[in-house]
């Protein structure tokens, strides 16, 4: 007798088909909110599964990182802010709003390549500075030498001792300035180019510089989470008409779903 599969024996009993559940019915939308030192507060939306039993939605939302363009956050025209990307990390969930804090800022790679030139010296500095409220930031500064007004030579290379002097002055100025401000004030200094202009003004007497830029900023270490400090950083959160409409719509959908069941 040939061994094989007996279709009649293996056939299961009559069962009802499993009702397909819509995936989006188990999810809800949240608004991503930036601190109050940016003009555009609610810069994005995200989605997450609803709270079910021990699976709390807020636990899955904390720690998420979102990226936006600085020109969109400050409503600025031109390319001065368009080439900088800012990242925020979610620290707390308040209703349908995700309260974020600064995570990092970086220039786009095409802008960095645009600044590179021949016949000059590139000066780079990596500085770690601590703010007054305990945040440790790592800043990467880049600058380029330029010709003097009466120079006839084709190149404008700088001597090594001058490069070290510029790097030393950049390091001291950044540490002194950031040690007196909190994280939000530090972000304002970085995004409004206040710190960059100060560095260029103090370093130009050493050697003529062009295009001094803070290429990258990232948060290396953070202090213990303080809910009150985060609320002070955000201030009054603007109401979202779309968020309120979603809450009303979901409240109306719940009784309808129960009646259908």
UniProtKB/Swiss-Prot annotation:
Annotated Gene Ontology cellular component terms: cytosolic small ribosomal subunit
Comp. bias regions, Basic residues: 1-18
Record GO terms (molecular function): structural constituent of ribosome
Keywords associated with the record: Cytoplasm, Ribonucleoprotein, Ribosomal protein
GO biological process: one example: translation
Primary location class: cytoplasm
Region: Disordered, residue numbers: 1-23
InterPro entries hit by this protein: Ribosomal_eS1 (IPR001593), Ribosomal_eS1_euk (IPR027500)
Domain of life: Eukaryota
Places the protein is found: Cytoplasm
Complex and partners: Component of the small ribosomal subunit. Mature ribosomes consist of a small (40S) and a large (60S) subunit. The 40S subunit contains about 33 different proteins and 1 molecule of RNA (18S). The 60S subunit contains about 49 different proteins and 3 molecules of RNA (25S, 5.8S and 5S).
HAMAP family, alphabetized: Ribosomal_eS1_euk (MF_03122)
UniProt similarity note: Belongs to the eukaryotic ribosomal protein eS1 family.
Name the record gives this protein: Small ribosomal subunit protein eS1B
Species the sequence originates in: Trypanosoma cruzi (strain CL Brener)
High-level lineage: Eukaryota, Discoba, Euglenozoa, Kinetoplastea, Metakinetoplastina
